[in-house]
Amino acid sequence: MADDTPRQRESISLTPVAHGLENMGAEFLEIMEEGQLPHRHSSLPEGGGSRSKAVWKPFSRWRSLQPTVQARSLCREHWQLFEWISKGLLSTAYIGFLIVACLLDFPRALALFVITCVVLVFLAYNLLKRLLGSKLKKCVKFQGHSCLSLWLKRGLALAAGLGVILWLSLDTAQRPEQLVSFAGICVFLVLLFAGSKHHRAVSWRAVSWGLGLQFVLGLFVIRTEPGFVAFQWLGDQIRVFLSYTEAGSSFVFGEALVKDVFAFQVLPIIVFFSCVMSVLYYLGLMQWVILKIAWLMQVTMGTSATETLSVAGNIFVSQTEAPLLIRPYLADMTLSEVHVVMTGGYATIAGSLLGAYISFGIDASSLIAASVMAAPCALALSKLVYPEVEESKFRSEEGVKLTYGDAQNLVEAASAGAAISVKVVANIAANLIAFLAVLAFINAALSWLGDMVDIQGLSFQLICSYVLRPVAFLMGVAWEDCPVVAELLGIKLFLNEFVAYQELSQYKQRRLAGAEEWLGDKKQWISVRAEILTTYALCGFANFSSIGIMLGGLTSMVPQRRSDFSQIVLRALITGAFVSLVNACVAGILYVPRGVEVDCMSLLNQTVSSSSFEVYLCCRQVFQNTSLEFGQEALHNCCRFYNHTVCT
């Protein structure tokens, strides 16, 4: 009788088969290295035996392959030695090339020399961290607990505060306008504290350290000669690097369009810069820099790991890309930490847009410095406006890791960066068209309403020039330049910073071209100090159109926290706007005029082919000087470019 019960299928393991194949392959390679091959007609020994005991006969064809197999085996055994030899030869060749380049023309090889030094510093740091990292960490931790007691910390803070006050009192004796900028910082901080969510919970350690780091960075960049030269050099290198965009855009759009049309001249720079940033992220360089900046701010300010990483990332990426660095942790972050994330996004600009603003002619070193200085200031002011009252889960950086993207190779990373920028470029172009059209409509409507009550020339810019004039003055801008700066602040706040920087570039171009300062009752350009302070004040995404961008980006990552994001987004926007204003005030305290004095006698007593800012300044001295100190040649040169009563 047949058994109807189904038989259980027996599992068959292929592991012995695999091991057998591996053994046969290894045995076969060993025989090949000996130059032998089993003969086709070889028979097994009497009494049986395995195939491995067959009679092997030499074979000339396999003997010819013996050197190749031996070389392969040698490389496999000593691959690490060959790797070190290759690295040594390449390093020696590179060092020799660098030495020859520096000996021939050091200024020409300066960029390569600086890059080499930076790479060597990174390599030395990683080597020391690998060898002595744990020991140094224990030593520093021990010293911190034993020496830096509470009274010593307070004493150091008091000494630092008194030092700043003493320095300001001595430094502002020659330039009183710096005191106005200092008063502006105090006013802005008082206003932010008045609007704080939890006044008694403010972490003054985070506020003081954040503002202190911002001041030290500004002091290094603006006041010290090495810092100023370094950032000026870095800005020049970025400008040269971005000029290579013209090769690609000229091929696609044509040289005529690239030179004459704004969209084809500026927007391709964003594509190129986004591609480069994507490559740097793939290589891990950006993550390394972000981690080190975040570590410095976290150690000094006592903030959590996630919020500090997001703010540090905002130095290089936009308000929607920086939260991606901490995307897995957004759901568990406190409201104060989310407020920091939003404030950091509003207080800085994206690295891709940095290239576009530099192409406008905006001072590159000021843009770079403003982006770096805004990071600690954003943390400080955010903790002032929305202090931490909950228990954070991310006090330690353990378990918090940065992603390296999904690209599999360098080419894919570059291609992905260029593809991502298409959406950014389209968004910028669409916003420019929409906002400029809306601005023109608003101005036309305001002018129409103003004509009804005999107010001529009423416009959005005119209203902003009156409403925001006190803000511009508190930044440290001269009163005669305040209306123009207030207009730009209004455009940045109610439209976007792209339009504001474009307007600022036009004022700067007119100044450099030597245009007259006033054309009727309208100012044609502003002073260099006002340009620098405005550059700092406009450096941020804090405008009302960014509210939707911020909410859309964060909500798409964590939909369940939509109500939390909506609750604090407006407060974060205002805080981000104040970060840019405080940044401008710090620049106003530290800014000193630089440049070589122009010899007006030598400049004007020769034929001048075109006007410039230096020519205008010298001609203004000629028109104001009633004596014959400059001579008729100087007066003739000035009257060729400017109309003045003296010329008649």
From Swiss-Prot:
Residue positions the entry lists as glycosylated: 605, 625, 643
Residue ranges crossing the lipid bilayer per the database entry: 84-104, 109-129, 148-168, 176-196, 202-222, 266-286, 295-318, 340-360, 362-380, 428-448, 471-491, 532-552, 572-592
InterPro entries membership: C_nuclsd_transpt, C_nuclsd_transpt_met_bac, CNT_C_dom, CNT_N_dom, Gate_dom
Record keyword Transmembrane present: yes
Catalytic activity: uridine(out) + Na(+)(out) = uridine(in) + Na(+)(in); thymidine(out) + Na(+)(out) = thymidine(in) + Na(+)(in); cytidine(out) + Na(+)(out) = cytidine(in) + Na(+)(in); adenosine(out) + Na(+)(out) = adenosine(in) + Na(+)(in)
Keyword Oxidoreductase (UniProt): no
Keywords tagged on the record: Cell membrane, Glycoprotein, Membrane, Symport, Transmembrane, Transmembrane helix, Transport
Top-level taxon of origin: Eukaryota
Activity regulation, short description: Due to its high apparent affinity but slow transport, adenosine could act as a negative regulator of pyrimidine transport under some conditions.
One Gene Ontology term from the biological process aspect of the record: cytidine transport
Pfam families the UniProt entry points to: Gate, Nucleos_tra2_C, Nucleos_tra2_N
Membrane side Extracellular: residue ranges: 105-108, 169-175, 223-265, 319-339, 381-427, 492-531, 593-648
Topology of this chain in the membrane: Multi-pass membrane protein
PTM: N-glycosylated. N-glycosylation is required for localization to the plasma membrane and the transporter activity.
GO molecular function: azole transmembrane transporter activity; pyrimidine- and adenosine-specific:sodium symporter activity; uridine transmembrane transporter activity
GO cellular component, one term: nuclear speck
Cytoplasmic side: 1-83, 130-147, 197-201, 287-294, 361, 449-470, 553-571
Protein's job: Sodium and pyrimidine nucleoside symporter of the plasma membrane that imports uridine, thymidine and cytidine into cells by coupling their transport to the transmembrane sodium electrochemical gradient. Also transports adenosine, an atypical substrate transported with high apparent affinity, but low maximum velocity. Therefore, exhibits the transport characteristics of the nucleoside transport system cit or N2 subtype (N2/cit). Involved in renal nucleoside (re)absorption.
PANTHER family tied to this protein: SODIUM/NUCLEOSIDE COTRANSPORTER, SODIUM_NUCLEOSIDE COTRANSPORTER 1
Similarity-based family: Belongs to the concentrative nucleoside transporter (CNT) (TC 2.A.41) family.
Name by which UniProt lists this protein: Sodium/nucleoside cotransporter 1
Source organism per UniProt: Mus musculus (Mouse)
Name of the gene this protein is made from: Slc28a1
